[in-house]
UniProtKB/Swiss-Prot annotation:
Subunit structure: Heterohexamer, formed by a dimer of trimers. The hexameric TusBCD complex contains 2 copies each of TusB, TusC and TusD. The TusBCD complex interacts with TusE.
Species this protein is from: Buchnera aphidicola subsp. Schizaphis graminum (strain Sg)
Coiled-coil region: none
Gene name in the database record: tusB
Assigned protein family: Belongs to the DsrH/TusB family.
Keyword match Cytoplasm: yes
Keywords, sorted A to Z: Cytoplasm, tRNA processing
Location of this chain's protein in the cell: Cytoplasm
GO (cellular component) term, any one: sulfurtransferase complex
Family matches, as PANTHER family: PROTEIN TUSB
Protein's name in the database: Protein TusB
Keyword DNA damage: no
Protein's job: Part of a sulfur-relay system required for 2-thiolation of 5-methylaminomethyl-2-thiouridine (mnm(5)s(2)U) at tRNA wobble positions.
Pfam family, one: DsrH
Chief location of this protein within or outside the cell: cytoplasm
Amino acid sequence: MLHTLMKSPFETNISFFSGMLKKTDDFLALQDGVLIALIDNIFLKKITFSSENLYVIKEDVYARGIHKNISSSFILISYIDFVNLTLKNKKQIIW
């Protein structure tokens, strides 16, 4: 399953959301959701514990000027890669 976070993690119930993630699920952060990938943020431990497949849209990361502060647990991908994730995952949840 693909879990997509588009809003800031401060506007989302991360405890509930991370409880829904399985280790094999794909997690993608885009738009303001990329803030969840910042090093040392309060949500990082919950999300890295919940899923092994963590992605952020690199265009959104660079647009916010945070590319040097992204956790190494996350893989930067393009919007084309995002399309491939949607093809891979028949089920999706947007948070």
